[in-house]
Structures are given as C-alpha cells and as structure tokens.
Amino acid sequence: MNHHLPSRPARSRQSQGLKGNLRVPGDKSISHRALMFGGLASGETRISGLLEGEDVLRTAEAMRAMGAQIDRRDGTWTIRGVGNGCLLEPEAPLDFGNAGTGSRLTMGLVGTYDMTTRFTGDASLSKRPMGRVLNPLREMGTQVLQAEPGDRLPITLRGPKHATPINYRVPMASAQVKSAVLLAGLNTPGVTTVIEPVMTRDHTEKMLSGFGAAIQIETDKEGARHISIQGQGTLKGQVIAVPGDPSSAAFPLVAALIVPGSDILIENVLMNPTRTGLILTLQEMGADIELLNRRSAGGEDVADLRVRSSALKGVTVPASRAPSMIDEYPILAVAASLAEGETVMLGLEELRVKESDRLSAVAEGLKVNGIDCTEGKDTLTVRGRPEGKGLGGATVTTHLDHRIAMAFLVLGLASERPVSVDDQSMIATSFPEFMDLMTGLGAEIEDRD
C-alpha cells in the first residue's frame, strides 16, 4: 500500500525541446465508474484502456469484496457483475488508500443496502471531508455507525431496510456528491433526483444511461440541472474503451508549452466539455494546442492534441470554470509561472479539501522556487517570469499529493535551477507511467538519492 512505502525524492532540470508521440493512461473518472457499474450490472462487462493506478485498483478490490468477479488478461478487464440490488456485505473493511473518488462513490453505492460496510484509507484520505456524501445518504435512511470527527475516515455505514428516495440540491459543485446520490438511488424504490446549480463532470449520468439505467436530465430556467434516476432497474454489462485522462495529459501538455523548441502529440485524450477548462484557459494564454482527429468513442468526445512551445500571457480564470479543471490548478500555476504578466485564479475553495490543502501546497511550492505569488482564501495570483530566470533551486513538500509532485517536476524542466520534490511514490495513484513517458520525450527527470 502506497501509504506505507518510504518516500522517494525526485529532481527535474532545464530540458531541451520535448519531442515525440505519447498516450496517457485511461481516464480516472471513467475507470472507477466502469469497474463499479460493470460490477453492479447483470452479465459481462469488458474494459480496455483502464487506468491501472492504485486508486482504481482499490475500486476493483472493493467490487470483488462485494461479489463481482473481475479478471484481467492481456490488458482487457472482464467483469461478471452481481446484478443491481445484489451486492454482498463485504467481510473486511474496504481500504481505499488515497482514492477520494472510489471511496465517496462506493459510499453512495452501498449506502442504501441493508448491510454494514466499513471504509478506511491512508493518512491523506483520512483528512478529507466525507460529510458532503454522508448528509444526503442520511436523508435516504443510511446510518453512520462510526466516523472520526468531521465525518472523516474510518467510517462504518449501515444501510436501511427500505431506503427513501430524495430530491437533493448539491450545496457545492461536486461530481462525487452528485454521483454518490445517483448511485444510492439505484437501489432505492421510486425516483431519486439530484439538482446541481453548476454543471460538473457528467460521466456518471452518461455511463449509467449506457448501462441501461432510466435517467432523465432537465435544465430549469435558472440553468440548474435536474438529474433523476428510477431506482431498482436492471443494468446490463457493456464493452468500454476508456479514453486517455485529460488530467494526466495536462502534465506533458504544459511541459511542452514551457520548454522551448517542444513539439509533441498526445493521442486519444478525452475531450468531454466538463473536463476541458485547462485547455481553454491555456489557449486564452496563447498556447499552441491543435485538436486533431476529433471523434466520438463510447458517447465521449476524444481527440489527439498537438502541442508546441508557446509564449504565454497571464489571464484571469473565472470561478465558473473551476469545476471543469479542479485537478488542473497545480499545473496551471506552473504554466502561469512561465507566462508574461499576472494570472489570477478565482473560486478555488474546493482545492483546500483535495489530497492535500492543494491551494496552500501550490503557493508554498511556487514561493520556495522564487515565484512571486499571492494566496487568498479561495484565489491564487501568480506573476510569471517568461524565461524561468532565477526560478527553481528548492525542494517542494508534496503532502502525499500526486498532482503536486508531477506539477513541480514539470516546473523544473523550464526553470534556471533544478526543482526537487520530497516524494514521487504517490504519482502511482493516478499516472504510474509518468516518469517513463516524460523522460521518453526528452525531459530531464531523475530519482534523487
């Protein structure tokens, strides 16, 4: 388990033009859901391109513990599901490691079953708030038998004999909360409705519909989305090809923009409009990103991205864009560090409850490496240095956060002095091939003894 491994420092240094073609691992959001819905569906589900990072593998283990048969052969995962309403009570606690998505979605999935389920996680996950998911489940009849103060892990849930459908307005822009309520609705009689004032990533609705769930989506005159699911229906196994994760593609993409003389092609990247906030922002900053071979795969938009080094200019990123790029702010802050002028990022409160307090971790890493930035309650302002002059030379504390580690290793590729991170081991949670893919493009990244 990654949270018991010794730390492994790494260092990156100024690199010459990055060149080559690459594929990033499968999308994390879709991978978690493909395993969950396949494990719940009747019949067989086959998945290719699954992200085989630690977080997703924890979801596979959880579904196995509740009765799904899951096998991997030659890169294809085959699942024989239990059928909707037929999950088995797990004998041991479900250990989700560092996986926020896996743990929160599974709480929704099991919360309306008449059984007891215990959730545990690593030190980082155990600091993250789970009340946002538990509150709607309580309304549906779920009992929280045990939790740490502030509704934190470890948590024990007991589902009701008869769950109650609810209409739930999500209090913050969170695809995980929306998804947890919809998954709880799968095993609840009647119609469960989630109302989201701001649209968040919509993989749950799209994929559940693809598996045969009765889902209706309407937008009211205020622009809020009402997503309704008819409970206790049948899900049928599917064949799924998982596209590349845009949140992982963000790292080589920004590296190519800021390392002079770079020209790379990132193939098969998910371009779902609820996930493309970073690309839109970088294009506003002057990034040369060309979308090639645009196509649809399994109901999702996919494209190849040709990225060439670019002179970037600072912009203001509106709060309304945060849900479509919540995982990309660390790497956007790195791009802003090499841009001319000031970049202002608004509406970042959600970053305070990620794998780390991601907002303060980013600001701290920028400052120790000579970057002029100001951290507000929910804002970050970065004043860039286009040539990377005087930047680097420090070690960044990653706080067990994979995206902090990757973002600052990218910073070092365009800084005057090397940048170190205190630990790279947790990169395996989302992007196990990161080091190999980056060095394959010509990035100077190495283990540091």
Swiss-Prot record:
Organism per entry: Chelativorans sp. (strain BNC1)
CDD domains: EPSP_synthase (cd01556)
Pathway where it operates: Metabolic intermediate biosynthesis; chorismate biosynthesis; chorismate from D-erythrose 4-phosphate and phosphoenolpyruvate: step 6/7
Gene behind this protein: aroA
A biological process from GO: aromatic amino acid family biosynthetic process
Name the UniProt record assigns to this protein: 3-phosphoshikimate 1-carboxyvinyltransferase
Family listed: Belongs to the EPSP synthase family.
NCBIfam families (alphabetical): aroA (TIGR01356)
Location of region: Disordered: 1-26
Keyword Cytoplasm included in the entry's annotation: yes
